[in-house]
Amino acid sequence: EISECLVGSEMCIRDRKMEEELLTAGLQAVKDNYGDQIKELFGLEVIVPTTPFPVVKLADLYKALEEEFGYTVDESEKGDLTTEAERLSYDWVKKHYGHEFLFITDYSAEKRAFYHMRDENGVPQGYDLIWRGVEITTGAQREHRYEVLKKQAEEKGLADDVKFYLEFFQYGCPPHGGFGLGIDRLTMLLCGQSIKDAEFLFRGPNRLTP
């Protein structure tokens, strides 16, 4: 996971610029150094994205998918992104923005981790990044205030389970944020392979060793 602990971390998480620059530079380096080999072996062109990446609120995305594809979900599911909505979001962003990446924001607090900071309306200050219809990143501004963090853990019935974690925040913690980038998923999508082939040592429900 890539984390930041600095004065401007909140703004960096909100505008997502750091991850855009990281992925753009990384894919440019892959294209420059291995683009020909990837095209020869997998028949795929390494595409370096333009910035900024498109951004959409989750509720607006569901509305757009219904209008565009007739895709609907029950109200109880609209606080999170379904697998089918992930897939359709790629078709939608390609058509309307000519882009392969899509940031999705404004998830339901019920569906996000207790340590995600929320705004004055209770909306988590985080996002998911979708590439080619697959989630590759979850990022967020983290809650650093002990009392707020404790309350959010209690709301999810986790206060006892994360007591050791909460104790650190009693001594003070600066504003911070971060994101976890799924390197295996990134490799899978880059080369057009299955996740089993993209990982060095695949782990799954039926494979724990070696």
Give the positions of each predicted feature.
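A generic hydrophobic-helix recognition signal that picks specific residues
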Residues: 1, 132-135, 175-177
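Single conserved hydrophobic/aromatic residue that forms the stacking wall/gate
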Residues: 1-13
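A residue-level signal for conserved active-site and pocket-lining positions in enzyme catalytic cores
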Residues: 5, 61, 104, 139, ...
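Short, glycine-/Ser/Thr-/acidic-enriched flexible segments
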Residues: 9, 107-111, 119, 134-136, ...
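Composition- and surface-driven signal marking solvent-exposed, interaction-prone regions
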Residues: 16-19, 116-118, 141-142, 199-202
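Metal-assisted phosphate- and nucleotidyl-transfer catalytic regions
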Residues: 18-132, 154-155, 160-164, 172
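Residues in well-ordered beta-strands of folded domains
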Residues: 104-105, 130, 137, 199-201
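Active-site pocket scaffolds in enzymes
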Residues: 140-141, 145-210
